[in-house]
Every structure is written in structure tokens, then in C-alpha cells.
Amino acid sequence: MTTETPVEEMSFETAMQELERVVDQLERGDVALDASISLYERGAALKKRCEDELKRAEEKVAAITLDANGQPTGTQPLDAG
């Protein structure tokens, strides 16, 4: 049995790659029922991790402030808007 990296420790890219592998395995349909359920649960956790990381990145981008010329000048607190 392999040791799986905890989903909460994965980068977005790693979680997305593993999610793609999980989906591929499930789509092939050659996995036993119990293994399919475990894969589905792992896939759901990976999907949530990717969504959370994307949301965090979007919030960072939204916090970038621009000057009159459209150049980045820094960031503003996320709750300032």
C-alpha cells in the first residue's frame, strides 16, 4: 500500500495532477467498488483543495492596487473593499 500525501499539504498543481489521475482511474471503470469509493472520496477532497487554492489566488490578485497609469503599487487588505 502506498502512502498518500495529505491533500491539505498539496500545492494546487500537485492536487490537480492527482485529481486528473483519480478521474482517469474512475472513468476506466476497472477499479473494485471499495477502491472506487475511496478514489471518489479522495477526488472530492482534491477538488475542494484546488477550489480553495484558486479562491485564495483570486483574492490575492484582487488585492493588488494600481496607480493612475495602471501600474501595480502594492496591495490592499482583503477586507478594505
UniProtKB/Swiss-Prot annotation:
SUPFAM superfamilies, sorted: XseB-like
E.C. number(s) listed in UniProt: 3.1.11.6
UniProt subcellular location: Cytoplasm
Enzyme's top EC category: hydrolase
Function description: Bidirectionally degrades single-stranded DNA into large acid-insoluble oligonucleotides, which are then degraded further into small acid-soluble oligonucleotides.
Family: Belongs to the XseB family.
Descriptive protein name: Exodeoxyribonuclease 7 small subunit
Gene name of the record: xseB
